[in-house]
């Protein structure tokens, strides 16, 4: 399997990040910006068991996940009409879903869902942008599928100037490096979803430098993101003229035009610790 086998002309991107970092919010607003401002044909495939990767694009409508339909109705019931929905600006939306709590492996669900979508030819040939929104706390076999099997050409990691977010980002970089030769996958850059901690921009610049990549965009914190989510919309749909919409527009443009893809140089735990101590995140 290579990334040329699905949606051959699309820019195929996987967005990784630890749970709660704002990865799905970032993915949906980026996808919405590409569709709204640049008239791109976009699809999001959510690879997070929370199945919230497309919620705002679909205005909060419940999404039948591939794994839910498979478990409850059987393989024959998994059709594009049932599991692939159309949202804001005709963005196509699919959620892998996961197992029942306490039973089975969510990573395995990602593998199954992607395989079924390929069989159903669920990734249209005329896509401009295809996003995989992937849980990044653990880069296990299933969640590493976009890396390992070359589903995505380039990976972007959402992080912030906080210890555990940086730890997860560094681990994801290790996963990218592991599969770089096998699948051709590369790191496109780091997206900082700002938490407004002291020295955050400087910390992110140095973190990117250590990984051998670049800060693709520093997304400032803004309460309009929560207001839009409360109204079950992306910021782009809620208020396309606001400052935060312009930030997401810039992020979308930076990703779409980026061709500086690298094999990352992950830090050792000692190096990461030194970095966060330098910026006062932890005391030793």
Curated annotation (Swiss-Prot):
MF terms in GO: 4 iron, 4 sulfur cluster binding; ATP binding; metal ion binding; nitrogenase activity
Cofactor note: Binds 1 [4Fe-4S] cluster per dimer.
Gene3D superfamilies: P-loop containing nucleotide triphosphate hydrolases (3.40.50.300)
Catalytic activity: N2 + 8 reduced [2Fe-2S]-[ferredoxin] + 16 ATP + 16 H2O = H2 + 8 oxidized [2Fe-2S]-[ferredoxin] + 2 NH4(+) + 16 ADP + 16 phosphate + 6 H(+)
Keyword list, A-Z: 4Fe-4S, ADP-ribosylation, ATP-binding, Iron, Iron-sulfur, Metal-binding, Nitrogen fixation, Nucleotide-binding, Oxidoreductase
GO BP terms: nitrogen fixation
EC number assigned by the record: 1.18.6.1
PROSITE patterns: NIFH_FRXC_1 (PS00746), NIFH_FRXC_2 (PS00692), NIFH_FRXC_3 (PS51026)
Post-translational modification: The reversible ADP-ribosylation of Arg-108 inactivates the nitrogenase reductase and regulates nitrogenase activity.
Binding positions ([4Fe-4S] cluster): 105, 140
InterPro entries with a match to the protein in the record: NifH/chlL_CS, NifH/frxC, Nitrogenase_Fe_NifH, P-loop_NTPase
Disulfide bonds: none
Cofactor annotation: [4Fe-4S] cluster
Modified residues (ADP-ribosylarginine): 108
Positions contributing to ATP binding: 17-24
Family according to the record: Belongs to the NifH/BchL/ChlL family.
Function of the protein: The key enzymatic reactions in nitrogen fixation are catalyzed by the nitrogenase complex, which has 2 components: the iron protein and the molybdenum-iron protein.
UniProt xrefs under PANTHER family: LIGHT-INDEPENDENT PROTOCHLOROPHYLLIDE REDUCTASE IRON-SULFUR ATP-BINDING PROTEIN
Quaternary data: Homodimer.
Record-given protein name: Nitrogenase iron protein 1
């Amino acid at each position: 399997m290579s990334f040329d086998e699905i949606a051959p002309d699309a820019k195929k991107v996987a967005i990784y990040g630890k749970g709660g970092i704002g990865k799905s919010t970032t993915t949906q607003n980026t996808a919405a910006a590409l569709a709204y401002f640049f008239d791109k044909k976009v699809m999001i495939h959510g690879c997070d068991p929370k199945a919230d990767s497309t919620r705002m694009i679909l205005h909060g409508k419940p999404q039948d996940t591939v794994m839910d339909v498979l478990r409850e109705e059987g393989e024959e019931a998994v059709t594009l009409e049932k599991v692939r929905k159309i949202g804001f600006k005709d963005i196509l939306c699919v959620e892998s879903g996961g197992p029942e709590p306490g039973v089975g492996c969510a990573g395995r669900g990602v593998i199954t869902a992607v395989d079924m979508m390929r069989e159903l030819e669920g990734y249209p040939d005329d896509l401009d942008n295809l996003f995989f929104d992937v849980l990044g706390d653990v880069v296990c076999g299933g969640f590493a599928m976009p890396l390992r099997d070359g589903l995505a050409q380039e990976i972007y990691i959402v992080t912030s100037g906080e210890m555990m977010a940086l730890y997860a980002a560094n681990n994801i970089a290790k996963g990218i490096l592991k599969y770089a030769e096998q699948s051709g996958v590369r790191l496109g850059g780091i997206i900082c979803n700002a938490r407004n901690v002291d020295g955050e921009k400087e910390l992110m610049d140095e973190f990117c430098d250590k990984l051998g990549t670049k800060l693709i965009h520093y997304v400032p914190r803004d309460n309009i993101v929560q207001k839009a989510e409360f109204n079950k919309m992306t910021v782009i749909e809620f208020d396309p003229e606001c400052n935060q919409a312009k930030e997401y527009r810039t992020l979308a443009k930076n990703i779409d035009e980026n061709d500086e893809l690298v094999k990352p140089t992950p830090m050792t735990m000692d190096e990461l610790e030194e970095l966060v101590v330098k910026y006062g995140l932890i005391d030793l």
